[in-house]
Amino acid sequence: SGPMPISDPYIMGVHHYDKFPKGNGEMGPNESLSGRKKGNDFNPENDWRMYHGEKIPGFPHHPHRGFEIISIVPEGFADHFDSKGSKGRYGQGDVQLMNAGSGVLHSEMFPLVNDDKENPLRLFQIWLNLPGKNKLTDPDYKMIWKENLPEGNFEDKNGANVNVKVVLGEYQGVKSVDPLKNSWAADPNNHVGIAMITLDPNTTFTLPNVSSTMKRYVLFYDGKSTIDIDSYKLQQDQLADLMGDQEIEIINGDSPAKILILEGEP
């Protein structure tokens, strides 16, 4: 859990993982908030955080401008409200694309919908730069519900399974939905790729040679063993900064693993 050290075309990336407790009937935690920094609770030592929320965890209204926000929620829920009138709840595998363009005010709160059991949340938020000519375009917004998120299953050379969910770009012949029209990802020459990969134990997965200028990052976010990337052992919650002009072989250890891939030309 925490920020990802990534660079252009990405402005920022954050992985939130919170083991939220049972809800209190009002979408907040059924636990004391004593000792937490009210309105600014980011302590990485805790199992969960309130962030800027005071009763419900999350990020109340705040502005964005000049970039695209990609929010991926594999587990838990997010409630979105914005100044353009869009609102809704998404999660459990859904993805939101939002071009902030000339400016938008929005909030994203993390409702604890279950009062009878814990409410774990996993969320990736990625800020992708907009082309200079598109920075002041009208804000735009698209939901990719989990049933519409392009997905494929493949066998590696040993018959082990690789599951690929493609948010932007194309992997193994699985192509994403159309990006937002003013996105950096709208030009295929920018080689923007965002995908979530689930690897069976002892699986091998290969990333192709694309270009010498492309940035490529792999975050190992969930798993009990290590992942080998060109003989380097990646531990859980570690991020690898890889070459874009090399074929990269990723070899999983002896338990299932989940990785996030981010690619793109600066």
Specify the residue positions occupied by each region the protein language model found.
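Jelly-roll (double-stranded beta-helix
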Residues: 1-266
